[in-house]
Amino acid sequence: LFSILLNEPLGIQTIPTEAETMSKEERFEELEQLAWQEALYDPGTLDWKEKWFLDGSRSTVANTEKGMILSAGPLEQDHACHTVLWTKNSFEGDVKIEADFWRLDTATRNVNIIYIQATGREEGPYTKDIAEWSHLREIPYMATYFNNMKLLHISYAAYGNQDDAREYVRARRYPTRPDLKFNELDIPPDNFETGLFEPGIKHRFTIIKKGHELLFKVETEEKMSVFAWNTSAFDLITEGRIGLRHMWTRTSRYADIRISVL
């Protein structure tokens, strides 16, 4: 019988997943071999408006021969300068997300985030279909998302809000609740100083969410890392849109974006 593990920060029990009975790398390879079916493909070179919509009036999206450049607005501390690029499609069940990524900024603070299967919390104006309340996100204030959306979040090429902050990869599960503050949404473990995400270097991302398993593989020509989290302290995320979030001043290029389901 599996033992029950205690998630100390939340006081919530988690149930061990298959990823915790083998190495992260072995489990990732096992999951990657499943019968995934492509549900979206975007090379990044075509008109982004065909498959995406944008939160943030001060951000830009540019399609180039090398991929799609997503740029947040230029002013730090101006919440209108955040951005989120959302898929028009919603994806149900288990999901695999792949993309080539190049960091184009040299920032040492603020974060990039991928939002996985986002829906509204279904209270007040925050209906299940997040496209229905896009007007409430013309200024993409972070709290609007973590208070009012159900989703999984992975931070990458991420830093704190101080220049000497350490680079990290972190997972979270939204939304907050009266008994659960934003800093309690973390899914352990955090991963600091990964040695990844140098500006101008091509990274291949592959994210797999299967049941309560969440894995993130990052590859460059010189390095490969797999990050893994057990999300079972929270209710299962089962459907929703995929979003790319850049905080103010952050800029990156994405290409060969593929989303698959089982």
Predicted features along the sequence, with ranges:
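Extracellular glycan-recognition regions
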Residues: P16, E20-L262
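Bacterial Sec-dependent signal peptides at the C-terminal "C-region" and cleavage site
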Residues: I4-T21
